[in-house]
A protein has these predicted regions:
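Acidic, Ser/Thr
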Residues: 34-36, 60-67
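Short beta-strand/loop segment at the start of cytosolic alpha/beta domains
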Residues: 2-35, 182-185, 189
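Core beta-strand segments of extracellular beta-sandwich domains
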Residues: 61, 159-161
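Structural signature of tandem-repeat unit edges
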Residues: 24-26, 38-55, 67-108, 118-131, ...
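Hydrophobic residues on conserved beta-strands that form the core of alpha/beta folds
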Residues: 31-33, 54-57
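Short, aromatic/basic amphipathic alpha-helical patches
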Residues: 159, 258-261
């Protein structure tokens, strides 16, 4: 079903006002903008708006008028996010937001949706969300803990949690069919591909089960050293190009990668 973007509905919470569009059949709601003040400490998204179940959160460039087309997206506060220029969407209006509770039936969390919320320490992504998009949590500098959704099937490994230097604990249900977390590393379910590492990890030991490392896998973290396990054969583009990585060592039994400095 499409969305009726010609008519806006609102929900007034205790600390913020949530602006939404309803689906054409009136069953689902899409919250695309939240009005906050510098006194707002909590964003508790409603599960329903006017009887419609909230299934989508964030701003999408499709909402722009064509003449207003812009290469940049916005966060949930309507502030422009420009990753290429280091602009994470921080604003005075969200300066004190410390907690975010997303709608329980959420299925789509747009890119850049929660970027720039610099005081949020932990977040649980509802289990119905299948994709973590680019820059969704970019610049959440205090974020320490994230619970990934059970149905996660797609993950933007480079920018989703970029500029989240304190993020050290990421959990994922063992029932997830696509990925698994292992000692702070996000691997494919078989454990043969390293996709991402939690940003706060200083030393990364690539397990012996891993044969390939995804593009950009370790680019956004603060790791200073990387140890490549004995089965690593393929290293993707910029996979170990993190700015702070100064030491890369290779398992003695690894016959695929020649020792280079």
């Amino acid at each position: 079903a499409g969305w009726n973007t010609g008519k806006e509905v609102t929900y007034k919470g205790s600390e913020a006002t949530y602006h939404a569009y309803l689906s054409e059949d009136g069953k689902n709601a899409w919250i695309y903008l939240v009005e906050t003040t510098n006194k707002t400490k909590s964003l508790k998204f409603p599960d329903t708006v006017e009887g419609a179940v909230v299934t989508r959160v964030g701003y999408d460039t499709a909402l722009r008028k064509l003449e207003d087309a812009d290469e940049f997206n916005q966060n949930i506060s309507g502030v422009t996010v420009e990753y290429a220029h280091g602009v994470d969407g921080w604003s005075e209006k969200t300066i004190n937001v410390e907690s975010v509770v997303l709608p329980k039936n959420l299925t789509i969390l747009e890119s850049t949706a929660l970027s720039g919320l610099r005081k949020v320490k932990s977040i649980t992504i509802p289990d119905g969300v299948q994709k973590i998009s680019a820059e969704t949590f970019y610049g959440c500098k205090s974020l320490k803990e994230v619970k990934l959704p059970k149905s996660l099937a797609s993950f933007d490994n480079y920018t989703s949690f970029s500029a989240c230097p304190k993020l050290s604990k990421v959990t994922l249900s063992k029932e997830n069919k696509s990925f698994k977390m292992q000692k702070g590393l996000l691997l494919n379910k078989k454990g043969t591909k390293l996709i991402w590492a939690v940003p706060a990890k200083n030393k990364i030991t690539v397990p012996d089960s891993v044969t390939s490392i995804a593009d950009n896998a370790l680019k956004a973290g603060k790791a200073t050293s990387v140890y490549l396990g004995k089965k690593v054969k393929m290293i993707g583009k910029d996979a170990i190009a993190g700015k702070k990585i100064t030491k890369v060592s290779i398992a003695k039994k690894n016959k695929s990668i020649a020792k280079q400095g």
